[in-house]
Amino acid sequence: MEKRWKWLKAFIKFVFIQFNQKQTSAMAAELTLSNMLALVPLMTVAVSLMAVFPSFEGVNTQVQALIFDNLMPETGLAVQEHLNEYVSKSKNLSAIGLGFLIVTSLLLMRSIDRSINALWETPTQRKGIHKILAYWAMLTMAPILIAASLAASSYFATLPIVSDLSGILTFGLPFILIVLAFSALYMVVPYTQVRFYKALIAAVITAILFEAAKYGFAIFVTKFSSYELIYGAITAIPIFFLWVYLSWSILLLGVIVCFGLHRFEVESEKHEHEFISVLKILQFFIQAQDKESSLSLEQLKSKFSYLHEQTLRGYLEQLLRLNFLAKLEGEQYCLKLTGHSLTIEEVYRRGNWRLPNNNQALSDEKNDSFSTPIEQANLEMAKALDVELVSTNSVNS
């Protein structure tokens, strides 16, 4: 139990450090602006898609109720009325106008994709037609799937077997649908492998945070009525902006939780200087080169199990940028130059690493081939730098 509690505390700390370091608040602000510009286009596209299917007639109201009742506090009702008015007017747009709405919606999809993949630290992005198809799938399939789920739930609710459970369904079904939507988002958007159960855990946490935020935001709006004195009839607009920003912050926090569930590990007892670790990684690649083979990420994780996966990936990214390594398909890596001609001095010079001191250079392994040359380098450096900072001849009287 104590070990799990220690892991949980370390994991929460990791999530919030990542949230701050990756400037997630700025991402949420950018997505809020994109969201506000694309809100009417998104609703127009969704309504148009559902109108294509006769069986979804009347489901549009239920979809809006699901979104506005479960993802927004009560103040969103005024915004919903105005949005419906704008959507009804947009139905009279020409083909060019409708195309503009679709492009605006796709730009929001692009912002979401870039933000989530930035939080996941994915080295590559979707390109060309794959990117367009992915965005179009997110844009078109989401409203259709939500409408289909609501239509199915309405049908099952009328069955005699489940009629007694209608109260539970009314409360639990929207929450389940939101969890599934977040799970799909956390699995599909990152351009990397995401485990379903970890995406589901992150989605449940995000949905719970949404419920708590919705409750707290409703209290905030009720208690602080000074907004109405300042903004008057347009009070709903700044409040809606604030809520959308809070919503994106929570959603991106869920992305970091999902990322952390894949990458986070409790700190190992063994501490090693980064330059020593990099040299050992390159030494392992030289051994693989002698066997004319590449190394997978799993092999590297197994060999350097005392390193966090995130730390190991960071070293690999640095070695890729310095042209020591080349990345192959399927997260395979190989040495980009002749290993036996590589020297410690070249690695140190090209990477601009900090040289470990003699205490840091010492390893638990008795036959560490790096300790002796690093100790000698430190001694030579100490001898060369053993000069007075300001000599008496250079001091101006």
UniProtKB/Swiss-Prot annotation:
Q: Does the keyword Aminoacyl-tRNA synthetase apply?
A: no
Leader sequence range is none
Q: Which domain of life is it from?
A: Bacteria
Keywords assigned by UniProt, alphabetized: Cell inner membrane, Cell membrane, Membrane, Transmembrane, Transmembrane helix
Where does the chain cross the membrane?
A: 36-56, 92-112, 132-152, 168-188, 201-221, 237-257
The record's subcellular location field reads: Cell inner membrane
Q: Name one GO cellular component term.
A: plasma membrane
Please give, as recorded in its UniProt entry, the membrane topology of this protein.
Answer: Multi-pass membrane protein
Q: Which HAMAP family match?
A: UPF0761
Family per UniProt? Answer: Belongs to the UPF0761 family.
Q: What is this protein called?
A: UPF0761 membrane protein Kkor_1635
Query: Which source organism?
Result: Kangiella koreensis (strain DSM 16069 / JCM 12317 / KCTC 12182 / SW-125)
